[in-house]
Structures are given as structure tokens and as C-alpha cells.
Amino acid sequence: MNQMNPAFVMPDVQSTPDTRQIPIQRVGVKAVRHPLTVRTQGGEVQPTVGTWNLDVHLPADQKGTHMSRFVALLEENKAPLEPATFRTMLAAMLEKLEAEAGRIEVSFPYFVNKTAPVSGVQSLLDYEVTLTGETRNGATRLFLRVRVPVTSLCPCSKKISQYGAHNQRSHVTINAELAGDVAVEELIRIAEEEASCELWGLLKRPDEKFVTERAYENPKFVEDLVRDVAQRLNADERIVAYVLEAENFESIHNHSAYAVIERDKRAG
């Protein structure tokens, strides 16, 4: 094996000038799986595994970015994830990469311990969460996305049938741009409270009876579901914009029913 000359300086190719004079809006690393901890609304720290995308703006005169520094940032970040620490992490990335603009996105499973409505038995239910932060033109924006599984029951089916109504599992996905701190649990509760019924990981027979009857007493089309959730988001001043989706995995069709509401409150 060749011995390296102590006087030899390894070239830093990515730091050399680029003559094509074309800026790159986003360059970085994608789909990096790395453990993290998340601070819950109650103050506890929950361990999970995140899938990270990190990128920065690259000026026209710079050949490449420092890819290893993105992963180094993940290794250095030990603070439980919450809006304040996420903003700090974004600022640290821009400093480390010597960039004026950048973006961090992390998706992870988030677990909530839920108590069954009648038996009181406890079980975990998982939710898909994505936190995104981006800095552009000196301004930082923060987005919280939560996908919430719920139950929906068809009002039309209930109206025309003598023996019940078709119901199905649905997904309510809220992607909110935040002006203040909003906990994951808060968005989960909004979606669950506006559905025909929420879900639990473990139910006993009395609980199943409750869930069935609760959904029957609270039928909603997919249009009702998104509008009712939208009313709650509209009333929350900490949320400045949102994209809201609802998808019903129809039990009597081989397709889904789908609805989307988008609103930017800054536009009136």
C-alpha cells in the first residue's frame, strides 16, 4: 500500500469554480434513514426512525456542494425534534454548507397511545408525519404534514338501506404551514374528531359495538369530511396555509373517493 506524502494536499474538487454559470436551486442528499427522537405534546421524548432529504442552493460559480456535511449534520443533531429545534437545525445546515437557501424534510412514524372507548384497553396507533423547513430569501417557512387513518360511513347508503350502511377506512392528510407551534397530536385530534369515527389499534367486543354505532350515527361523505376539517384549520391562527386531502377506500367499489381543499390565508 502506498504511503501518503505528509506534504501532499488532497484537492477539493467540488470547491473549484464552475465556468457554465448555471445555478442549481436544490442539491443535496435524499432518502437518508437515520434515527431521531421527537418531543410529544406531553413533553415526553419518543424514539423513531426518520427518512431525511436535505438540500441547499448552489451558486452558479461553484462546482459542487459538500455532500458529507449533510450526513454530518444528522450525526451532530441530538436534540429532540420539535419546531424550535428544527429551525435551529435548518440554520445550522445553511451555516455548515455556506448556503443562503436550503431545505430539510424528514418523514417518520409517530405513535400515540390510545385508550379504547368502552373497555379502556390501551394500544398504540401509528401515524405518518412529515416535517419540512425551508429558508429562501432570508425567510424561513415550516410545514407539518400528518396522515390520519379514520373511519367514514356513507350518508346515502344509510338513507336508502334498511340494514346498515357501507363504511370504510379513510385517510385524512393535513399539510399545514405554521406561524406558531402546533403539536402533531393537535392535527391528529382535528381529523379524528371530524371523521365518522376514529380508529384504535386494539378493540374488545364492546368497543367494536361502540365504533360501529358511532360511525352509523355520524355519516359523512368525503366532501363533508374535508369541509369539516377545513373549518377547524380556518379557525386556527397558528396555521397560515394548508393543503387538506381526504381519501375513502370505498368498500363497495374498487376505487377511492377523494377530495382536496387548499387555502392560503394570506391571500384572503
Curated annotation (Swiss-Prot):
Keywords: Hydrolase
Protein EC: 3.5.4.16
Any one GO molecular-function label of the UniProt entry: GTP cyclohydrolase I activity
Pathway note: Cofactor biosynthesis; 7,8-dihydroneopterin triphosphate biosynthesis; 7,8-dihydroneopterin triphosphate from GTP: step 1/1
Highest taxon listed in the record's lineage: Bacteria
Name of the top EC class for this enzyme: hydrolase
Catalytic activity from the UniProt record: GTP + H2O = 7,8-dihydroneopterin 3'-triphosphate + formate + H(+)
InterPro entries assigned: GTP_cyclohydrolase_FolE2 (IPR022838), GTP_cyclohydrolase_FolE2/MptA (IPR003801)
Site-annotated residues for May be catalytically important: C154
Family: Belongs to the GTP cyclohydrolase IV family.
General function of this protein: Converts GTP to 7,8-dihydroneopterin triphosphate.
Protein name, as recorded: GTP cyclohydrolase FolE2
Organism: Paraburkholderia xenovorans (strain LB400)
Name of the encoding gene: folE2
